[in-house]
Amino acid sequence: MKKLLIALMTTTAAMSLAVTAEAADKLKACWVYTGPIGDFGYSYQHDQGRLDVEKALGDKVETAYLENVSEGPDADRAFERLAREGCKLIFGTSFGFMDPEVKVAKKFPKVMFEHATGYKTSDNLGIYNARFYEGRYILGQIAAKESKAGVAGYIVSFPIPEVVMGINSFMLGAQSINPNFKAKIVWVNTWFDPGKEADAAKALFDQGADIIVQHTDSTAALQVAEERGLKGFGQSSDMIKFAPKAQLTSITDDWGPYYISRVQAALDGTWKPGNVWLGIKDGAVKMSAYTNMPDDVKAMAQATEKKIVDG
């Protein structure tokens, strides 16, 4: 069983599982991540949101997180552990955490829970998501313009609604530019495994794709594109520093404002379980700088982005 790692971040900087007398008066907000916060992708961006909470709310809050939590029995234990250790608001950030959160939320009715990308709610469990498909439509348009082969390699994690939605949106965007555009797909059945992601990228390039897309969390696939002199897109975070010549753009997740608002609601006593779906218009989904592409392609992407914002 993968060992659960916990880090408790306080303004005094020490890492500890103990709650001090001073911290006892604070609201303790906690996060559970399926990957490491150093993935520079999905889990990293959620953790940046946690840090935004600390900066915005200061000594009103105490935060903690668990990283590298497997979806399954480990998740049950992770959520229960945090609830028992005094977390009053707990965010689960992976689709596979849904049933564990439902189970633990029922067991701890006085604790507030939120689950990202899921669909099950209860009196003390809300859900939240972002319209990542909006960004994937733009990626598809760019890919169709930039790919000489008319073929993208698409690395995907698990066959869940969020991932399938992303594939469909990407292809709709691509085929709005080139009706004959195709994508070759590799399912790696993991959110974060740099080795598998790199191998998948190499295989897709070897099979004729000349641009890479991913719904996994590491920078490995984009780095393969950089090594081969090909193009690709970052995922969840701006990965330009890992592939300065290969990255065309990246869908970036900005969870900070949402997390701040929900923790503030918990502090105010106004928190209620919600069903929130944020997008480009709300600033939760952002496109990083459009780079390594002609001006006309950049203008096309910016125009599509504006249309999405304008509705």
Where are these regions (language model features)?
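Positively charged n-region of N-terminal signal peptides that target proteins for export
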Residues: 1-4
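Bacterial N-terminal signal peptides
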Residues: 7-16
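Sec/Tat signal peptide C-region and signal peptidase I cleavage site
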Residues: 17-23
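A residue-level marker of the well-folded mature domains of exported/periplasmic proteins
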Residues: 24-311
